[in-house]
Curated annotation (Swiss-Prot):
Organism the protein comes from: Citrobacter braakii
Single GO molecular function: ATP hydrolysis activity
Subunit record text: Homodimer. In presence of tyrosine (or high concentrations of phenylalanine or tryptophan) and ATP, it self-associates to form an hexamer.
InterPro entries in the cross-refs: AAA+_ATPase, ACT-like_dom_sf, ACT_dom, Homeodomain-like_sf, HTH_TyrR, P-loop_NTPase, PAS, PAS-like_dom_sf
The name this protein goes by in its record: HTH-type transcriptional regulatory protein TyrR
GO CC annotation: cytoplasm
Disulfide partners: none
PAS domain sequence ranges: 78-120
DNA-binding region listed in the record: 482-502
């Protein structure tokens, strides 16, 4: 039987309660005092008459405002809540004392190690989990959690061990043990895959920190709601396919199919049947399958003149004929095209139909190269590090202090895809818990070899010149990391270089990174 006594803060009140229980020969099993004015009593069951009499006498004690029965003592309630939480967790969880002996194990851990709760308490963590010195870690008086890759029964787990501190009598935090959680890398990978699959809400996958990329995303949001053909241009690896899919998801056609065809990856004779279908085989083409939705034609600059003519006809009235059939089919499809080529130059050289270019160029989205978006490089790096570490089931490495300087000054000729591949390669070969510049393979990059695309030629002559000048300074500053060395390399005064670096924010960027 448990009672909750509401009372005032009066000296001697608790003693009077205890004296009353002694007087009635009641066996007290436990007492807990809450600082906010509540006393909890736990004693054996009483007959109704004795219980009613006891309640009346407790209420007559000076300072007692009320008394009532409760199902649990506060400590019992907390213990039951914790037990329910641990039982509900799908991940194995262990509680360790300062000798790394197991004090508590949830059902998931009992199942993993094939032991009962009692048998688990007879083991230390090291007897069940190899590859980590638990005792040495506890003796080091850790303040933060630590992650470690471990193998248990042939399964890969990410082990996270967290120190448990309690406040001692002198108000200092004392280490009393640790909590170990084991997360299956297979389960984590599936969860990440499901999350990635579900988190396709339009532009949520696109990193946009710089003002220029924010403007591009905002422009894309507006263009996404329209039905006219959309032309997306940009260098290789800038994310044209990602923007195309985002535009579909942000459009009224989001619930309808989205299909993509790379015009450079399949032979010319196969492109026609892929897009328009093949009647003798009963095959539906992309346009028919995506009726009501969107179709991305990637690398549109690689499309043959004959297919350009057929595409132009389809764009004009939305009708086409399947290969081997005279019957016309009408569909409602938004066509999104992407290219890294300069279509204007191709038109001038007779390699691309002028009328098709103007039909596609109604709505245009130009994606800038990553070298023009230095503010986006580290957020992209952090995103890919987190993503690939989680997928591989390894702890996320810390990024070294000098990594930002190197990555933001590199030219990234392959743009976002280049960053993604470089980070993936680095993580698969990383030894240790810190990602450093030497861990990332960055081939020599010559800014002078970069092709001048349409996006580079935007704006006035001063804007184009400034953009190119900033790119040159950014690249050379990597190899000549002082204003005097850079000035000597370029044959100008130290003051002139200092002013230019300040103008483009390169000197401030270096200071902030240092």
């Amino acid at each position: 039987m448990r009672l909750e006594v509401f009372c005032e803060d009066r000296l001697g009140l608790t003693r009077e309660l205890l004296d009353l229980l002694v007087l009635r020969s009641i066996d007290l099993r436990g007492i807990e005092i809450d600082p906010i004015g509540r006393i909890y009593l736990n004693f054996a069951e009483l007959e109704f008459t004795n219980f009613s009499s006891l309640m009346a006498e407790i209420r007559r004690i000076s300072g007692v405002t009320d008394v009532r029965t409760v199902p649990w003592m506060p400590s019992e309630r907390e213990h039951l809540a914790l037990s329910a939480l641990l039982e509900a967790l799908p991940e194995p969880v262990l509680s360790l004392d300062m000798k790394s002996k197991i004090e508590m194990a949830n059902p998931a851990s009992c199942q993993l190690f094939a032991h009962t709760q009692d048998r688990m308490r007879n083991h230390t963590a090291a007897q069940l989990i190899n590859g980590f010195n638990f005792q040495r870690w506890l003796e080091s008086n850790p303040q933060d959690s630590h992650s470690e890759h471990v193998v248990i029964n042939g399964q890969n787990f990410l082990m996270e061990i967290t120190p448990v501190h309690l406040q001692g009598e002198n108000q200092e935090q004392m280490l009393t043990g640790a909590v170990v959680m084991l997360r299956s890398t297979i389960r984590m990978g599936r969860q990440l895959q499901n999350m990635t699959t579900q988190d396709l809400s339009a532009f949520s996958q696109i990193i946009a920190v710089s003002a220029k990329m924010k403007h591009v995303v905002e422009q894309a949001r507006k263009l996404a709601t329209l039905s006219a053909p959309l032309l997306i241009t940009g260098n290789t690896g800038t994310g044209k396919d990602l923007f195309a899919h985002a535009c579909h998801l942000a459009s009224p056609r989001a619930s309808k199919p989205y299909l993509a065809l790379n015009c450079a990856s399949i032979p010319e004779d196969a492109v026609e049947s892929e897009l328009f279908g093949h009647a003798p085989e009963g095959k539906k083409g992309f346009f028919e399958q995506a009726n009501g939705g969107s179709v991305l034609l990637d690398e549109i600059g690689e499309m043959s003149p004959r297919m350009q003519t057929k595409l132009l006809r389809f764009l004009n009235d939305g009708t086409f004929r399947r290969v081997g059939e005279d019957h016309e089919v009408h569909v409602d499809v938004r066509v999104i095209c992407a290219t890294q080529k300069n279509l204007v130059e191709m038109v001038q050289k007779g390699l691309f139909r002028e009328d098709l270019y103007y039909r596609l160029n109604v709505l245009t989205l130009n994606l800038p190269p990553l070298r023009d978006l230095p503010a986006d490089i580290m957020p992209l790096t952090e995103l890919f590090v987190a993503r690939f570490a989680d997928e591989q089931g390894v702890p996320r490495p810390k990024l070294s202090a000098d990594l930002s300087t190197v990555l933001t000054r590199y030219g990234w000729p392959g743009n976002v895809r280049h960053v993604k591949n470089a980070i993936y390669r680095a993580l698969t070969q990383l030894e240790g818990y810190e990602l450093r510049p030497q861990d990332i393979l960055l081939p020599d990059y010559d800014a002078a070899t970069v092709a001048v695309g349409e996006e580079v030629m935007e704006g006035s002559l001063d804007e184009i010149t400034s953009r190119f000048e900033r790119s040159v300074l950014t690249q050379l500053y990597m190899n000549y990391p002082s204003t005097r060395k850079l000035a000597k390399r370029l044959g100008v005064s130290h003051t002139a270089i200092a002013n230019k670096l300040r103008e483009y924010g390169l000197s401030q960027q270096k200071k902030s990174e240092e």
